[in-house]
Amino acid sequence: MEGRLLLLETPGNTRMSLAYDEAIYRSFQYGDKPILRFYRHDRSVIIGYFQVAEEEVDLDYMKKNGIMLARRYTGGGAVYHDLGDLNFSVVRSSDDMDITSMFRTMNEAVVNSLRILGLDARPGELNDVSIPVNKKTDIMAGEKKIMGAAGAMRKGAKLWHAAMLVHTDLDMLSAVLKVPDEKFRDKIAKSTRERVANVTDFVDVSIDEVRNALIRGFSETLHIDFREDTITEKEESLARELFDKKYSTEEWNMGLLRKEVV
């Protein structure tokens, strides 16, 4: 089977990037070619659909440090992004509404991709991938999370998207968390920092090398030949409309707007 590979990113505008993700998914029709998209975001925090920004992140800290706030179309928790993490999404036809099997299949593709790079990765929770930590050489024992994901589905189509930490600023990632009491900030930030890791903590690779491994891993796991393509006029038009009416508005990004406007 042939698929579409989209290298479509707007690093300086995370909100526009999310509009593209939703537009590509909503434009997809059952039987269309599967889509694999790669993109990055400059410093920003993306909250999940059901979250309220002021409850999840330190808005004052974000403002002082020039970090953009955005809210995505799917659920899940708040995620910090910068140019050191790699985002990717998959849209494909579906005959069922089983979201669990979707996450398992996508996680399998990611794990296979990371093993191409020489990483001993394995699925963590349903929506993330971790790397075992060597207790003899690492201070923190256990597992460290390097990727989280979210998804959506409707009749005939499924969307899955993920963010992988390649060489992200993990100190900044920890600092943007919302902490109820200021005196606990350092403790919670340290705890968060100890639970996550970059791919480059384990292997010396570039963003491009990780992307190429993911293309190969998804192609082999899903049995799809992804070929580079461009966004369609329909997808572009819907993305612009979604950005203007939803993703660019404070009501949406703060988590106060619940109804669909497009």
Curated annotation (Swiss-Prot):
<dbReference type="Pfam" id="PF21948">
    <property type="entry name" value="LplA-B_cat"/>
</dbReference>
<comment type="similarity">
    <text>Belongs to the LplA family.</text>
</comment>
<feature type="binding site">
    <location>
        <position position="132"/>
    </location>
    <ligand>
        <name>ATP</name>
    </ligand>
</feature>
<comment type="subunit">
    <text>Heterodimer composed of LplA and LplB.</text>
</comment>
<keyword id="KW-0436">Ligase</keyword>
<keyword id="KW-0547">Nucleotide-binding</keyword>
<feature type="binding site">
    <location>
        <position position="80"/>
    </location>
    <ligand>
        <name>ATP</name>
    </ligand>
</feature>
<feature type="binding site">
    <location>
        <position position="77"/>
    </location>
    <ligand>
        <name>ATP</name>
    </ligand>
</feature>
<feature type="binding site">
    <location>
        <position position="145"/>
    </location>
    <ligand>
        <name>(R)-lipoate</name>
    </ligand>
</feature>
<dbReference type="GO" id="GO:0046872">
    <property type="term" value="F:metal ion binding"/>
</dbReference>
<feature type="binding site">
    <location>
        <position position="145"/>
    </location>
    <ligand>
        <name>ATP</name>
    </ligand>
</feature>
<feature type="binding site">
    <location>
        <position position="149"/>
    </location>
    <ligand>
        <name>ATP</name>
    </ligand>
</feature>
<feature type="binding site">
    <location>
        <position position="163"/>
    </location>
    <ligand>
        <name>ATP</name>
    </ligand>
</feature>
<feature type="binding site">
    <location>
        <position position="149"/>
    </location>
    <ligand>
        <name>Mg(2+)</name>
    </ligand>
</feature>
<keyword id="KW-0067">ATP-binding</keyword>
<feature type="domain" description="BPL/LPL catalytic">
    <location>
        <begin position="30"/>
        <end position="226"/>
    </location>
</feature>
<feature type="binding site">
    <location>
        <position position="85"/>
    </location>
    <ligand>
        <name>ATP</name>
    </ligand>
</feature>
<keyword id="KW-0479">Metal-binding</keyword>
<protein>
    <recommendedName>
        <fullName>Lipoate-protein ligase A subunit 1</fullName>
        <ecNumber>6.3.1.20</ecNumber>
    </recommendedName>
</protein>
<dbReference type="InterPro" id="IPR045864">
    <property type="entry name" value="aa-tRNA-synth_II/BPL/LPL"/>
</dbReference>
<comment type="pathway">
    <text>Protein modification; protein lipoylation via exogenous pathway; protein N(6)-(lipoyl)lysine from lipoate: step 1/2.</text>
</comment>
<dbReference type="GO" id="GO:0031405">
    <property type="term" value="F:lipoic acid binding"/>
</dbReference>
<dbReference type="GO" id="GO:0016979">
    <property type="term" value="F:lipoate-protein ligase activity"/>
</dbReference>
<keyword id="KW-0460">Magnesium</keyword>
<comment type="pathway">
    <text>Protein modification; protein lipoylation via exogenous pathway; protein N(6)-(lipoyl)lysine from lipoate: step 2/2.</text>
</comment>
<feature type="binding site">
    <location>
        <position position="72"/>
    </location>
    <ligand>
        <name>ATP</name>
    </ligand>
</feature>
<dbReference type="GO" id="GO:0032991">
    <property type="term" value="C:protein-containing complex"/>
</dbReference>
<dbReference type="GO" id="GO:0005737">
    <property type="term" value="C:cytoplasm"/>
</dbReference>
<dbReference type="InterPro" id="IPR050664">
    <property type="entry name" value="Octanoyltrans_LipM/LipL"/>
</dbReference>
<feature type="binding site">
    <location>
        <position position="138"/>
    </location>
    <ligand>
        <name>Mg(2+)</name>
    </ligand>
</feature>
<dbReference type="GO" id="GO:0009249">
    <property type="term" value="P:protein lipoylation"/>
</dbReference>
<comment type="function">
    <text>Part of a lipoate-protein ligase complex that catalyzes both the ATP-dependent activation of exogenously supplied lipoate to lipoyl-AMP and the transfer of the activated lipoyl onto the lipoyl domains of lipoate-dependent enzymes. Can also use octanoate as substrate.</text>
</comment>
<dbReference type="InterPro" id="IPR004143">
    <property type="entry name" value="BPL_LPL_catalytic"/>
</dbReference>
<dbReference type="GO" id="GO:0005524">
    <property type="term" value="F:ATP binding"/>
</dbReference>
<feature type="binding site">
    <location>
        <position position="137"/>
    </location>
    <ligand>
        <name>Mg(2+)</name>
    </ligand>
</feature>
<feature type="binding site">
    <location>
        <position position="135"/>
    </location>
    <ligand>
        <name>ATP</name>
    </ligand>
</feature>
<keyword id="KW-0963">Cytoplasm</keyword>
